[in-house]
């Protein structure tokens, strides 16, 4: 058991080291931070969606924006489209599960907002449809994806694809990236500038 535990920890570290060592990922994260900062400066909001563990990540990241990450500061508008069971089940029943995020993007999204769709496989149909609807409205779309980015990468403005085939490692990297984004956005907007 000890060897298995150590192997899992090493695997997690290796996935993150791939991101750290490839300057492309650092630049992509920086671009995402800048997009979110610009949206907030313009009085816009961030919408987030995902399935399963990615739904939990959506809620986690939204909570960091609305409550706080490190600093006591003004709340930032962020909505996880995964939390209203009445809306989710109504859309799933009356339309289809594939439409659960698309309909909410149509209802809550405004031009200039940001949508972060999270999918470890990159092949979540409901994320693809949410991205398509967001583009119709004029919402900037960001994908936190895994594996090869799947179909989702073709429908978002900024796909960030974690370089791993292992779902748990992708999920761990997604929440790490979410934390980095929240941390820098908060610092930049509320007086603690981050060094280049």
UniProtKB/Swiss-Prot annotation:
Cofactor binding description: Binds 1 zinc ion per subunit.
EC number: 5.3.1.28
Superkingdom in the source lineage: Bacteria
Pfam short name (any one): SIS_2
Coiled-coil stretches: none
Domain SIS: 36-195
Places the protein is found: Cytoplasm
GO cellular-component term (any): cytoplasm
Name of this protein: Phosphoheptose isomerase
Organism: Clostridium acetobutylicum (strain ATCC 824 / DSM 792 / JCM 1419 / IAM 19013 / LMG 5710 / NBRC 13948 / NRRL B-527 / VKM B-1787 / 2291 / W)
